[in-house]
């Protein structure tokens, strides 16, 4: 069935990609899960635990544990909301922003090297991105309707 092959194709590239990205993250003393949350904060700051959990489709306790490590490593700051004391806003520290920029450059070099070894056109990449974004939105909606 084509739809099964379609989804399996995404799954099959995930682990090999992680194996290539891990040395970059290890060099900067950050785990992949931490990197994903740090990147999410960088793109959406200020943000909250709940917003991160929703966007990343992860449980709040998992996000909380990862955020704790990022705070302990002085990569993010937490500020209480003036309107709602229960709400806390997360932003990158200068150290976190510097790490984000450095890791982004290293990961981008890796990604460009992989793409250069293929015959994928810019249009094909953009179409794939569009399709994956559509699927991601649907999956998030489905997950939150449970």
Curated annotation (Swiss-Prot):
GO biological process, one term: response to stress
Record-level Gene Ontology MF annotations: DNA binding; DNA-binding transcription factor activity
Disulfide bond sites: none
Top-rank taxon: Bacteria
Name of this protein: Uncharacterized HTH-type transcriptional regulator SAV2265
A Pfam family of this chain: MarR
Keywords: DNA-binding, Transcription, Transcription regulation
Domain HTH marR-type: 1-137
């Amino acid at each position: 069935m084509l739809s099964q092959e379609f989804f399996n194709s995404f799954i099959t590239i995930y682990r090999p990609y992680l194996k290539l990205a891990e040395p970059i993250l290890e060099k900067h003393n950050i785990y992949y899960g931490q990197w994903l949350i740090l990147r999410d904060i960088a793109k959406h700051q200020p943000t909250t635990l709940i917003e991160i959990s929703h966007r990343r489709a992860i449980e709040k306790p998992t996000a909380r544990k990862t955020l704790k490590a990022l705070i302990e490593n002085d990569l993010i700051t937490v500020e209480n909301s003036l309107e709602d004391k229960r709400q806390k806003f997360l932003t990158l520290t200068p150290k976190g922003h510097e790490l984000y920029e450095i890791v982004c450059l290293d990961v981008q070099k890796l990604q460009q090297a992989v793409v250069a070894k293929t015959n994928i056109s810019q249009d094909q990449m953009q179409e794939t991105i569009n399709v994956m974004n559509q699927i991601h939105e649907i999956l998030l909606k489905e997950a939150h309707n449970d």
